[in-house]
Regions:
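Sec-dependent N-terminal signal peptides
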Residues: 4-13
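C-terminal segment of classical bacterial N-terminal signal peptides
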Residues: 13-19
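Surface-exposed, glycine- and small/polar-enriched segments that build interaction surfaces at terminal
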Residues: 20-159
């Protein structure tokens, strides 16, 4: 009876951990080889050796390649940063991709925002669907036909 009760308590604790979708620290070599799993929303720090993935990130993301399926609020530092929806904060890397809105600062060789970029993009190539801010780079693109300056070298801006 004592062994059964102990086994049930361990099973209940494991189920609680598995059901939790929030984490404070994530360590990753290559997804799915990460703790906790990619479906986790992270409120803290993620360290990626090669590739890490999570649902949402509020905090710091450091590594080689970082993928966030939904939203980022914080700082991403990686060779490649990729976000499925919105970013509020900063991205520092070689390549930064944001599929929806971005608000903050991007620094990379290539910065790409799928919707509106609000803030500052500094890179070799900068692209945004719409821009409320400043782009500084060799090539700067704004896809929105409403913008006055859609493609400019060195400096581009939109309001």
């Amino acid at each position: 009876m004592k062994k059964l009760l102990t086994a049930l308590m361990i099973l209940a604790a494991a189920a609680t951990l598995k059901a939790s979708t929030d984490g404070y620290v994530m360590l990753s070599v290559f997804s799915p080889g990460q703790i906790p799993i990619a479906a986790t929303s992270l409120n803290g720090v993620r360290l990626n050796a090669l590739y890490g993935e999570c649902q949402n990130l509020n905090g710091l993301d450091v590594g080689l390649v970082g993928r966030v399926r939904e939203n980022v609020n914080g700082l991403q530092i990686a060779a490649v940063n990729s976000v499925g929806t919105d970013v509020v904060g900063a991205q520092l890397g070689l390549v930064n991709f944001v599929e929806a809105d971005f608000a903050g600062f991007q620094f990379a060789l290539w910065n790409d925002v799928g919707a509106t970029a609000k803030g500052f993009q500094l890179g070799l190539v900068n692209r945004a669907n719409a821009l409320e801010g400043l782009q500084i780079g060799l090539l700067n693109f704004i896809d929105d036909p409403q913008q006055t300056c859609r493609c400019l070298p060195i400096v581009n801006f939109g309001w």
